[in-house]
């Protein structure tokens, strides 16, 4: 009779051990990440990143963004150019330069005499810009329209001579190209291209956030007023401390982080997030300058 309570007591203890042992093992095998985030404005002192959400991801945010590109690829510039109502020569020029920007000093400086003579839109704008200089050094045509049918060989030779003279004049007087872009405003497709690029970037960032949260999120934590945060009970592995869809701002500085950290069983990894290990805001597929 005295052995039964002892047996029951032993069975109870064994039962509790069986219940608690997995919890104990899990606690011993998991790790922890403590981090502090601070931003230093230019010429200023470090400031804590207060009450912002940080994410512990099982994949680098940059790699996740690359994965998202499979779902939201950048717009095709050549396809965009094919849809424009411009000359074939203009389309060829845009594809060769990989640019649809037809305004600004950099654009006009990039134009060669061959570009201006060979692309009808450039030639028309150039001639319109320089028509006032005829008689003061600018070439004048010798060919006559009546010769186009009456004497086509003479017409062709004199027109080619005139074009060659203009080509030579452009090379000798490069400043004559200045202001050409003012007559290209109605043809400039740059703004339409920018809209496409901006829309793709928005969709790409949306897909990146979706993948990060649905496939690769291990933990998340908010920083306190001192910029401290922690991820507890994390399985041993390599992770990345990241910000998703937000930036840490201080003065003229805007940062986010995608910092790797290794979590070991039963240990606490400590990470200092600062300007030194931050990355610049994403500028993936920066086609807006084309």
Describe the role of every protein-language-model region.
Residues 1, 15, 286-290:
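Charged interaction patches that mediate protein-protein contacts
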Residues 2, 25-26:
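N-terminal targeting/docking segments
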Residues 2-13:
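Bacterial N-terminal signal peptides that target proteins for export
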Residues 11-23:
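Bacterial N-terminal signal peptides
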Residues 28-290:
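Long luminal/extracellular ectodomains of secretory-pathway precursor proteins
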């Amino acid at each position: 009779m005295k052995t039964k309570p002892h047996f029951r007591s032993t069975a109870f203890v064994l039962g509790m051990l069986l219940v608690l042992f997995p919890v104990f093992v899990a606690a011993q095998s998991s790790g922890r990440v403590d981090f502090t985030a601070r931003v230093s404005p230019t010429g200023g002192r470090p400031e804590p990143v207060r009450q912002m959400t940080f994410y512990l991801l099982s994949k680098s945010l940059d790699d996740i963004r690359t994965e998202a590109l499979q779902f939201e690829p950048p717009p095709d510039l050549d396809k965009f150019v094919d849809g424009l109502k411009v000359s074939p020569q203009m389309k060829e020029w845009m594809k060769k330069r990989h640019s649809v920007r037809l305004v600004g000093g950099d654009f006009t400086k990039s134009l060669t005499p061959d570009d201006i003579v060979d692309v009808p839109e450039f030639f028309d704008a150039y001639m319109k810009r320089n028509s006032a200089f005829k008689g003061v050094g600018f070439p004048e045509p010798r060919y006559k329209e009546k010769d186009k049918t009456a004497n086509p060989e003479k017409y062709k030779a004199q027109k080619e001579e005139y074009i060659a003279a203009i080509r030579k004049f452009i090379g000798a007087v490069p400043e004559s190209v200045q202001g050409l872009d003012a007559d290209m405003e109605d043809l400039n497709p740059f703004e339409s291209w920018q809209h496409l690029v901006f829309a793709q970037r928005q969709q790409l960032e949306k897909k990146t956030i979706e993948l990060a949260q649905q496939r690769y999120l291990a933990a998340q934590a908010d920083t306190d007023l001192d910029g401290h945060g922690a991820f507890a009970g994390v399985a041993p592995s390599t992770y990345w401390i990241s910000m998703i869809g937000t930036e840490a701002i201080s003065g003229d500085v805007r940062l986010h982080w995608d910092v790797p950290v290794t979590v070991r069983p039963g240990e606490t990894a400590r990470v200092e997030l600062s300007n030194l290990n931050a990355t610049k805001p994403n500028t993936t597929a920066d086609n807006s300058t084309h």
